[in-house]
């Protein structure tokens, strides 16, 4: 044990605990830490379904790009009357929705372009200029919130310390573990820091059928400086440390072996079916925009990311599936048992877990006992 009441999982399944403030101690010179700098949109909108005069809540969950001018068309989940104080899974259905219906959302007006393949999910289009849509969201929207947080959240409550472009529908919450002090300490110790931007989606829709589709496709952007830093670190044999599942999703979608752009699930499947990993020094990532449309889970072959700092997640959620790409189920189950014993928090403002990918751990050990696998649970 590293401290009397704090938990790393080694090859023998031994779990160690440490405060989140010590996370930099488990990194090493030559590592590259990459975080998602997306700021969170006020994506929850109370309003009225004009044809029925029924009260509704609209939760924006997707748009096609990160372009600030591309702010008219969204996919959204629509609830009946109520707000976050009622558990999402207990929220009533909206009134019957049809293409052409007008939704009055405070200063904003939106038209349903299409009801998608679920009665609660629609494609809607806001009226007005991009500037007026942004202004209406800022004035009337609130952060998407769930019932376990009983106090209404302000927008700044869901912005991480590195929040920049407002494109996320829920916060990329792993970045709450960062602060400018820890980033400064990283750089003082020869640990590089870079960012990507990915429009983090929602963690729950309240409907089991829709939740099984999560995560929805997520647009992302990888800056040239970040791509260059990745190339340099991999060439020098360093590790890529992803801050959160959204960073893993973006980087693994963009990762290539031959210099061609990552494009489709089919190409990923063909690569995995061919057997074995190419030498990791050959892995590259292209700068630019993309849309992460893949699912990452226990069968995934991670091409680029060596370790992840993540929130602690419920085993039935899509975020947890990403953790299964890094660690075997038995060790994760042991970690979850420790999590419950220590009463760690599992929501977006909860505690953190640091996991090094098992294959990477065998050749890039970072601790005195030469563990081939380690995991760090960090109380807030």
Regions inferred by a protein language model and the residue ranges of each:
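A cross-family signal for N-terminal binding/gating loops and helix N-caps
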Residues: 1-367, 374-380
